[in-house]
């Protein structure tokens, strides 16, 4: 019977596992998806509250032709950002600035973009690359808060090849590299640009993927199931392709038991904790100003890495008359906060908030999400692990997730497209 041997065995039903399983089902393949929790979605989730929507992780995904195709196949309508969310701020000298660089820093950036080779040197950290190509001012005021908001990492430990390699492939200037990448990327001329979501948040996309897999007659999702070992899967389903999409730590555990070459990476590759808090209130954080959010450089006096202004980003995110913000804490430079109690985290948030606004807006509610090991540290050890995967994984086994050459949901989606549609998992 066909059900006995699916085309794919997928371990982990977070965003990555659901995505690979859905792409397989859309191609008419069968999938057995194993998930140790009693629900799918992993880190990503959308919770409806009386005050509005809460996103437990990412608040959106960069649009691409791949996302538009996927949404169309699942019958979903993409939601674009509001015009008023166009402005993005970085905190500088006591206020949110759209352009935090001095005149001299700006000249240095222009010189770097046009005149310095952006080629990444062996073992170079993002910090070293940034200082060399863009100058110290840009690193401190733009690159550090910008990448800190995405990777939550310390730029001095972050591998430039791993974090920036997707954008830089030649010896030319940064401008030349970016132009070359833009030429390669397939575009739909009518494509909506920038960050997008769905009416019910990113959870709507995850629910639709889950429903698609469940509706496939030869596919099945097994919840509350500890992952079977690689050897037992290969024994039971010798013809099935295997996709590990269960996060860095669990993937390493499974790989190490099957292939000794990966054992050393269990100790070397680390993850970071992240805390997100969505706060509902009656007043907008920036008064009459609006925008996407504010990033806080490490020396700006804030404990938060940044804050998203949810009410300005997507329509329908709050109930009438309310406003919502999501503060993000933790990462490499603040590993203690994941150990805090919810009440302590809320106090930290309210103290940070007082530094932004003078208005005394009583909070209506806070929704705290603590991820003790959410994000991989994008360091040289992780780069080596990725290269080892490219070299040593046997045919028919794939290891995927936010540690594979790109941390964001859009990077995972683009890579999944290459693996599933073109069987190009190597970079």
Give each language-model segment a name.
Residues 12, 82, 217, 221-226, ...:
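Short loop/edge segments at beta-strand edges and connector loops
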Residues 7-33:
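N-terminal Rossmann-like FAD-binding beta1-loop-alpha1 element of flavoenzymes
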């Amino acid at each position: 019977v066909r059900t006995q041997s699916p085309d794919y065995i997928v371990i982990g039903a977070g965003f990555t596992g659901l995505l690979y399983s859905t792409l397989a089902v859309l191609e008419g393949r069968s999938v057995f998806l194993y998930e140790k929790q009693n629900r799918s979605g992993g880190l990503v989730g959308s919770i409806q509250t009386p005050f509005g929507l809460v996103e437990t992780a990412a608040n959106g995904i960069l649009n691409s032709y791949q996302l538009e195709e996927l949404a169309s196949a699942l019958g979903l309508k993409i939601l674009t950002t509001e015009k008023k969310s166009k402005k993005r701020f970085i905190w500088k000298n006591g206020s949110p600035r759209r352009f935090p660089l001095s005149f001299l820093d700006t000249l240095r950036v222009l010189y770097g973009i046009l005149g310095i080779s952006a080629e990444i040197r062996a073992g170079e950290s993002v910090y070293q690359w940034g200082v060399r190509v863009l100058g110290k001012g840009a690193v401190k005021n733009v690159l550090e808060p910008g990448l800190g908001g995405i990777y939550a990492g310390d730029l001095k430990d972050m591998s430039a090849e791993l974090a920036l390699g997707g954008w830089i492939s030649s010896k030319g200037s940064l401008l030349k590299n970016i132009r070359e990448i833009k030429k390669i990327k397939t575009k739909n001329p009518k494509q909506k640009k920038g960050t997008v979501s769905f009416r019910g948040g990113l959870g709507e996309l995850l629910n639709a993927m889950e429903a698609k897999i469940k509706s496939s007659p030869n596919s099945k999702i097994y919840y509350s199931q500890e992952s079977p070992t690689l050897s037992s899967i290969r024994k039971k389903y010798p013809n099935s392709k295997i996709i590990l999409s269960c996060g860095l730590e669990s993937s390493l555990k499974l790989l190490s038991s099957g292939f000794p070459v990966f054992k050393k990476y269990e100790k070397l590759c680390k993850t970071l904790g992240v805390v997100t808090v969505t706060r509902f209130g009656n007043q907008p954080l920036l008064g009459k100003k609006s925008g996407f959010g504010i990033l806080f450089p490490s020396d700006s006096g804030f404990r938060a890495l940044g804050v998203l202004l949810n009410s300005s980003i997507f329509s329908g995110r709050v109930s009438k008359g309310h406003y919502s913000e999501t503060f993000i804490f933790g990462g490499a430079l603040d590993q203690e906060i994941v150990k805090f109690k919810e009440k302590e985290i809320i106090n930290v948030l309210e103290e940070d908030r007082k530094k932004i606004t003078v208005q005394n807006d009583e909070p209506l509610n806070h929704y705290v999400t603590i991820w003790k090991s959410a994000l991989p540290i994008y360091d040289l050890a992780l780069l080596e692990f990725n290269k080892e995967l490219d070299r040593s994984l046997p045919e028919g086994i794939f290891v995927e997730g936010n540690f594979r050459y790109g941390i964001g949901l859009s990077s995972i989606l683009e890579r999944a497209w290459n693996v599933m549609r073109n069987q190009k998992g190597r970079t």
